[in-house]
Amino acid sequence: MGPDNRRILLATVLSVGILILWQVIFPKKTPPKPAPTPAAEVAKPAAPAAPAPGAAAPAVPAPPPDAPEETVKLAGKGFEATLTTYGGALKSLQLEGDKFRKQEKDREVQIDLVHVTAGQPYPLSLSASPELGGAADVTADPGARAPMRIVAKDASSVTFEGRVGNLAARKTFRVTGKPYELALDVELTGGAGNGTVGVLYPAFMPPDTKSGGIFSGPPLDFVRPVCRAGTTTERFDLAKEGAPEKLEGQVSWAGVDQHYFVAAVLPAEPVGTCTFARGPVKGAGVAALAIPVEGGARKLSLTVYAGPKDLDTLRGYGRGFESAIDYGAVAKFFALFARGLLYVMRWLEAIVRNWGVAIILLTVLVRLVLFPLTYKSMQSMNEMRKLQPEIEKLKAKFGDDREKMNLAVMQLYQKHKVNPLGGCLPMLLQMPVWFALYAALQTSVELYREPFLWMKDLTAHDPYFILPIAMGISSFVMQKLSPQPADNAQAKMMLYFFPGFFTVIMLFVPGGLTLYIFVNNLLSIVQQQLMMKHQRAAPTPAAGK
């Protein structure tokens, strides 16, 4: 490779590496957005329907305000939901199975997709103030946690009755038999005229929680309210302060995004508005679906999905639900490629029954696909290696005159029809695969907590740093086998600094990506050794011919 071209490649790789390292070691909090238009400037809709003068009182009496809490558990496919009489809502939803566990202090617990704090309503509670004229209207709406009565229950369903503002409300939760799914039927009666009721999905996250950087994924407990309107999926930042925000259009679902998981409510038909408000404490907020109530009554069928972000499952719901998978700023560019890699790895994992082995086989497949190009590249590198004696003579001839020496080296390459950029090709071809695999590891729940050898989770970094060190050693060997630049200082940097710097970066990235790069390095070394052995008997080009 020509000296100038090596400098360009080295500068590019180091720049990307420094950016990756900075983002991984110093993950930033989510930056604040510009303050939205205060909801006070938006015309508020009519209040919830009130009974007409002289109309009969609703048949459903309100429970005493100090009624003790009752809970009911429903076991669904892959989850256990705990429902509470406080708001007739979802108090807990724990995912089942060893895969869906997380470390909490000194023990492992099941992942719970309900994240609320004191004073917040529970998910799927109803509010008489869905348009959020002020944060206190709904984020701390006492009516949203008002006690309801359990009027019916069995092994697969529970029905609550109570009041929402001036409306009588009947809510029935049912286990559908589908993975991670509940059905919620709502019946509102006893009003007059037109109004609006909100279906709430609150969330809470400690304010000091880091969101991750461009190249570093968010922690497992990083949560954000999310809404889908038309073709836009908007995630709301719980860390910042500001007035309520409105998402207008055909709102098809709303809920809470939690890295590899999503909990969302999907109405049978799109509604007109999703509103997000912060409070009652910092780090807390709620997304509300505004449901029109016409003529003082409304029946509503809702689907609740709370589980892993499996791409095929989310696509099965339609409504753009697969956009719940957030590929991030950089990874989004490689999203299609990442999905392709994931499908290949799924196929391989179905055969070998281990995701680590599937990544190794993926590495082999990619090498086979790229073999024609990498073979030509290594041929070019071997031709450059044969010219090393001539390059040494030029170094002795021109001494410290680097400009003349570099010019003479380039003329030597041209004379023997050697492409100095050929050695860059293997790395350049692999970089899109690296980014796509990184995107797959950060967004694909299939790989979450999947073990390989000493690693318990391929989506997390190697806890013992064995793979990064092995990868660094293999990178050093690769550099030793590559033709060295004529510039001694540059040669030392390529030989020592580059593998060392790359090793430091790999300390903090998912173990699955480090495994891929390490195996790819080993295959490159083997291929290079075989080619060198095959071409060792070939005559060295003469400078004067």
Curated annotation (Swiss-Prot):
Subcellular location as annotated: Cell inner membrane
Any one GO biological process: protein insertion into membrane
TM segment ranges: 8-28, 325-345, 355-375, 421-441, 458-478, 497-517
GO MF annotation, one: membrane insertase activity
CDD domains: 5TM_YidC_Alb3, EcYidC-like_peri
Chain intervals with Low complexity compositional bias: 38-59
Region (Disordered) location: 31-69
Membrane-topology descriptor: Multi-pass membrane protein
UniProt-listed InterPro entries: Membr_insert_YidC (IPR019998), Membr_insert_YidC_N (IPR028053), YidC/ALB3/OXA1/COX18 (IPR001708), YidC/Oxa/ALB_C (IPR028055), YidC_ALB_C (IPR047196), YidC_periplasmic_sf (IPR038221)
Alphabetically ordered keywords of this record: Cell inner membrane, Cell membrane, Chaperone, Membrane, Protein transport, Transmembrane, Transmembrane helix, Transport
Keyword Ligase among record annotations: no
Any Gene Ontology CC annotation: plasma membrane
Complexes and interactors: Interacts with the Sec translocase complex via SecD. Specifically interacts with transmembrane segments of nascent integral membrane proteins during membrane integration.
Name of the molecule in the record: Membrane protein insertase YidC
Organism the protein comes from: Anaeromyxobacter dehalogenans (strain 2CP-C)
Taxonomic lineage from the root: Bacteria, Pseudomonadati, Myxococcota, Myxococcia, Myxococcales
